Amino acid sequence: MRTTYLAKPGEVERKWYIVDATDIPLGRLSTVVASILRGKNKPTFTPNVDTGDFVIVINAEKIKLTGRKATGKIYYHHTLHPGGIKSKTAGEMREKTPERLIETSIKGMLPHNTLGRKQALKLHVYAGSEHNQQAQNPEKLDITNLI
């Protein structure tokens, strides 16, 4: 007799949360958001089922990078052409594409498989304070007490 509850994909209830990234360290924000995207904050967490909630991150341009990460942390990507490796520092990414900086950080904390890619689709990041998910009535989540 099995007494462990295993969630089924059809019976998962999802909520929308909104998180303000102003003056919060990038790694601390990313761990909390990745945990919510996976559903680890729920008692019905099941590792092989997407039980997570939707998360909207606003004010990505005001994220805090501690220490020397603004100049010392380098992100690489390849253009798929010979000799096409490109690099940007975390400070440059925060200035030009702050959404991409947060998305990259959070996606690195999710599982590296099809389930993780599905969970990453529930993340919405905006550089400013405006977002276009008002119809979902997101619940404001204060993560300062969670970090």
Swiss-Prot record:
Family matches, as InterPro entries: Ribosomal_uL13, Ribosomal_uL13_bac-type, Ribosomal_uL13_CS, Ribosomal_uL13_sf
Quaternary state and interactors: Part of the 50S ribosomal subunit.
Gene this protein is translated from: rplM
Gene Ontology molecular-function annotations: mRNA binding; structural constituent of ribosome
Keyword field contains Ribonucleoprotein: yes
PROSITE patterns: RIBOSOMAL_L13 (PS00783)
Keyword set, alphabetical order: Ribonucleoprotein, Ribosomal protein
PANTHER family: LARGE RIBOSOMAL SUBUNIT PROTEIN UL13M (PTHR11545:SF2), RIBOSOMAL PROTEIN L13 (PTHR11545)
Record's protein name: Large ribosomal subunit protein uL13
One of the protein's GO biological processes: negative regulation of translation
HAMAP family xrefs: Ribosomal_uL13 (MF_01366)
Entry-linked Pfam families: Ribosomal_L13 (PF00572)
Family: Belongs to the universal ribosomal protein uL13 family.
Cellular compartments per GO CC: cytosolic large ribosomal subunit
SS bonds (residue pairs): none
CDD domains recorded: Ribosomal_L13
Purpose: This protein is one of the early assembly proteins of the 50S ribosomal subunit, although it is not seen to bind rRNA by itself. It is important during the early stages of 50S assembly.
